[in-house]
Regions:
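A short glycine/serine-rich beta->alpha loop
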Residues: 43-49, 83-86, 117-122
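Short terminal or interdomain "cap/linker" segment that borders an active site or interface and mediates
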Residues: 155-201
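Nucleic-acid nuclease catalytic cores
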Residues: 121-172
Length: 201
């Protein structure tokens, strides 16, 4: 079993993790993208983005690089890495993107955010997979003696982004954010990063 095999019902039955849809209401302020990011995203519109790989290269990675530079490399980015949360229970598998607190480690140190590219542009499938990865990330951190009250993730088609908060249960955001309003998207990411800056020392 792998992260992509889990349903939300599986997470509740196997781990007692329930889920709820609600507006997460991020206390965020829009962030004007740099000229570099504007050009990257403008260039992406001219490309035939037909696959998850193309989407990550032309859309997701530039946004993550922008955020990393804005935050003086507070986090590092792992792409396509395997994260084992609980092998016996199937919480394992390749992750599209993991943001981890930057400790200069070659391995994933403290996973704090997961991004799942929605296969076949199916956000619901992405929500399920991302939710399983967040449960796995919590198990991974606990094995290292790291307790975190909240973890965040999102799934994206490139054009549409939907966020998840994992605390006492999974909270799936009713709101969606759009690449066409990238300043608002950057603001949501920044509010999450600011939360981690205040809780991770």
């Amino acid at each position: 079993m792998a992260y992509s095999d889990f349903t939300l019902s599986d997470l509740e039955e196997k781990f007692g993790v329930t889920n709820q849809r609600k507006a997460l209401n991020f206390q965020s302020k829009a962030i004007e993208p740099t000229q570099w990011l504007k050009k990257e995203l403008l260039d992406s519109k001219e490309m035939p983005i037909k696959s998850e790989k193309a989407r990550s290269e032309w859309i997701v990675v530039p946004i993550l690089k922008e955020l990393r530079n804005l935050n003086v490399k507070f986090f590092t980015i792992y792409s396509g890495d395997n994260l084992v949360g609980d092998k016996e229970k199937g919480l394992q598998g390749e992750c599209d993107f993991i943001l981890s607190k930057d400790t200069k480690s070659y391995d994933i140190s403290v996973p704090i955010f997961h991004i799942v590219e929605a296969k076949r542009n199916d956000l619901e499938e992405g929500i399920r997979q991302c939710s399983a990865q967040l449960v796995g990330a919590k198990k991974y951190n606990e094995k290292k003696g790291i307790k975190m009250d909240k973890l965040f993730g999102c799934t994206t088609t490139g054009d549409v982004w939907q966020f998840i908060e994992f605390s006492d249960q999974l909270y799936i955001d009713n709101n969606k954010y759009y690449l066409s309003e990238v300043d608002n998207l950057l603001g949501v990411f920044q509010s999450i990063i600011d939360y981690y800056k205040s809780t991770l020392k």
